[in-house]
């Protein structure tokens, strides 16, 4: 049951993250739609948000508690089976999915920050500098591939 609860909690974290990503690309926060300078010509961060939304839905599907499932096994010697291994397998996938959702939020957040002409704290700026060495702002549609 602990793994079921952890999966549900992580699923909720992913869902909240995707909603923040949606808020960034919605055009309602003083940022351009899809976080791209020319949203009519470029789709910007629309597809990463679609991806996050799809992963959130998969997490919801994976979060049906495994602990509610049991079947008699071992020729009737075990009348209640915890299905702990199945819960662990599903939890592992939810962890991977949530990592991807959070990475998509980070991608969108750094893109959004680039549209603001404001400086953050030295600590945040140092993190952004490291991140921007790896990924800079996308001004036009570009292929995004993260090797894991």
Question: Which sequence ranges carry the predicted segments?
Answer:
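C-terminal auxiliary extensions adjacent to catalytic cores
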Residues: 1-148
């Amino acid at each position: 049951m602990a793994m079921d609860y952890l999966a549900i909690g992580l699923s909720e974290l992913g869902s909240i993250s995707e909603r923040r990503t949606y808020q960034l690309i919605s055009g309602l926060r003083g940022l351009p739609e899809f976080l791209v300078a020319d949203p009519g010509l470029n789709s910007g961060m629309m597809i990463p948000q679609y991806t996050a939304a799809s992963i959130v839905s998969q997490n919801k599907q994976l979060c049906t508690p495994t602990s509610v499932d049991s079947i008699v096994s071992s020729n009737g010697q075990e009348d209640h089976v915890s299905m702990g291994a199945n819960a662990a397998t599903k939890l592992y996938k939810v962890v991977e999915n949530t990592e991807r959702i959070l990475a998509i939020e980070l991608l969108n957040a750094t893109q959004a920050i680039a549209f603001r002409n404001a400086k953050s704290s030295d600590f945040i700026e140092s993190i952004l500098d490291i991140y921007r060495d790896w990924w800079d702002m996308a001004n036009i549609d570009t292929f995004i591939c993260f090797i894991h």
